[in-house]
Structure formats: C-alpha cells, structure tokens
C-alpha cells in the first residue's frame, strides 16, 4: 500500500525481525477502499448524514459504494501527493468492496502469486485484505461482507504448491473466526 499505516506497519515488522535489505513494493492497488463522500467524516457525522443502516450497507455490502467524493475535495486522491504517479483514470471517486477486489486481485495475481514459494509479507488494510481473503478462500459475495478482519493481528497463510494448507491469526486472544481447515 502507499498509505502510511501499512508502510509503518511493514517497517515495524521488518525491524523487529531484523530483516534488512528486503525487496519492498509499495503499491496503490493494496490501499484501503476509497469511501467516497464518507472520507473525512467521523462516525457521528456519517450517521447524521446517511443513517446507521445506510452506513453499514456502504461499509459491508459487496457492490454498494457510497456517493462519490468531489474531485475538488482535499481528501480526494487526485489532490494527495502520494497518488501523483498513478494514472488519473485509475483513481476512483468512490469504491465498493467489489471495486476494491477488482483492484487488488489483478495486482495479487501478477505480483504476489508468482512468488508464493517465498516468504511474503503483505501489509495492507481491512478491505484490501478482505478482498484477498475472498479470492484465496473462495468466499461468496454474501459471506465476504461478514468476514471480520481484526486490525493489527497478522494473518499467517501457509501454502504449498499454490494450495492453502492453513490460515490463522497470530494473536489468538484477538482472533476472529476465519475458516476451518
């Protein structure tokens, strides 16, 4: 991801593990989902404007994005320096989880999947990780919206010859139900 939270998290992991000189790819495709007009609002402001039920629908449904963010907003990616090298036609005004999936999975297939015989760290965000889980665990559109991705709890996925053998959260006390293997 290009977002500072994931970069700082990755640096913390690499420093803690004393891993230096690692190949690091910061890719906008792994950024958090773009919440459109909800960007910059706190939860109370969101509820006031849209209502709690609509906010839940925006946040968890597969194909229901919030209203677009105006391109003139200081929160729009077009107005943020870290996005200056991304083609403007690739920068969304809003995204659903489906849109996030359509951004994350091609990147995964091209850049991560070919390296699955190596140890890989993906430092990303709730909805980009949720999109990866949908793909990796073959979850349907209904089940993906109920999948909980706990913040700051690494998910270890063990694969062998491209097949997932095991997946578990490393902090068992804060783990959410994932899948049974």
Please tell me what each predicted stretch does.
Residues 86-101:
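Surface-exposed cleft-lining segments at the edges of enzyme active sites
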Residues 3, 47, 97-105:
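Amphipathic, non-transmembrane alpha-helical scaffold segments
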Residues 111-118:
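Glycine-rich phosphate-binding loop signature in dinucleotide/nucleotide-binding domains
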Residues 1-77, 83, 134-158, 162, ...:
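Phosphate-coordination/substrate-recognition cap region in phosphate-metabolizing enzymes
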Residues 25, 118-132, 157:
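Beta-strand elements within well-structured catalytic alpha/beta cores of enzymes
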Residues 1, 102, 122-124:
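Short beta-strand scaffold positions
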Residues 171-181:
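Acidic, His/Gly-rich catalytic cores of divalent-metal-dependent hydrolytic chemistry
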């Amino acid at each position: 991801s290009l977002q500072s939270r994931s970069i700082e998290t990755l640096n913390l992991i690499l420093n803690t593990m004393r891993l230096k000189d690692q190949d690091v790819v910061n890719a906008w495709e792994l950024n958090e989902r773009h919440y459109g007009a909800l960007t910059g609002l706190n939860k109370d402001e969101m509820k006031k404007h849209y209502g709690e039920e609509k906010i839940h629908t925006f946040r968890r449904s597969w194909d229901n994005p919030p209203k677009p963010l105006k391109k003139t907003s200081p929160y729009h990616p077009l107005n943020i320096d870290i996005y200056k090298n991304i083609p403007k036609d690739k920068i969304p005004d809003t995204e659903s989880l489906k849109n996030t999936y359509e951004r994350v999975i091609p990147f995964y297939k091209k850049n991560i999947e070919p390296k699955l015989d190596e140890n890989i760290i993906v430092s990303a965000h709730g909805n980009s990780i949720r999109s990866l889980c949908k793909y990796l665990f073959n979850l349907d559109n209904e089940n993906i919206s109920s999948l909980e991705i706990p913040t700051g709890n690494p998910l270890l996925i063990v694969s062998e010859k491209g097949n997932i053998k095991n997946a578990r959260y490393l902090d068992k006390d804060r783990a959410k139900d994932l899948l049974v293997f």
